[in-house]
């Protein structure tokens, strides 16, 4: 499953690998990878494979789920497709409460005591997913865990999720993606080394000249 999804993401250009010409994230950090899972919305077969995979993860790890919650905005569509497949209620969670109207942070009906699984498109440092989890917990929901399309497998993300006491499972990850990219001839040994070094310590830009 991990390599299949990784292959899909590479084929449609949802993931870009540029170890020799790094991207600069909004945080200022240099990165050899950029992920835009919103592109999956435009490819029916890919988004169907993702929805089926997320459903499988949820049934395996969180079988008692009662409602699906999407993170705004990238997780909303995938949460909708998964909830439809599973015939479950759905809501979505904003990064912060609206400044007008009812001031809702959670849109849709999430009731106190309901068992929720959060659907996220990408796990990097885990910040947006944890914000979603905290909002649901404050509303009295029981958050069973998070499922996502892809994770960078960053230690900072793992540590934050552990500190928040929330389980997280992804359809694909950085390791599988770099392996598939190498198998497809998209990157060579030198590029693979740079990608591996970045993964070990993203904050240290020594990987750029590795």
Curated annotation (Swiss-Prot):
One of its GO terms (molecular function) is magnesium ion binding. It catalyses: orotidine 5'-phosphate + diphosphate = orotate + 5-phospho-alpha-D-ribose 1-diphosphate. InterPro entries: OPRT, Or_phspho_trans_dom, PRibTrfase_dom, PRTase-like. NCBIfam families: pyrE (TIGR00336). Pathway: Pyrimidine metabolism; UMP biosynthesis via de novo pathway; UMP from orotate: step 1/2. Homodimer. The keyword Glycosyltransferase applies. The lineage of its organism: Bacteria, Bacillati, Bacillota, Bacilli, Bacillales. Orotate binds at residue 124. It comes from the Bacteria. Its EC number is 2.4.2.10. Catalyzes the transfer of a ribosyl phosphate group from 5-phosphoribose 1-diphosphate to orotate, leading to the formation of orotidine monophosphate (OMP). Keywords: Glycosyltransferase, Magnesium, Pyrimidine biosynthesis, Transferase. 5-phospho-alpha-D-ribose 1-diphosphate binds at residues 94, 98, 100, 120-128. The keyword Signal does not apply. Its cofactor is Mg(2+). One of its GO terms (biological process) is pyrimidine nucleobase biosynthetic process. It is an enzyme of class 2 (transferase). Belongs to the purine/pyrimidine phosphoribosyltransferase family. PyrE subfamily. This is Orotate phosphoribosyltransferase. Disulfide bonds: none annotated.
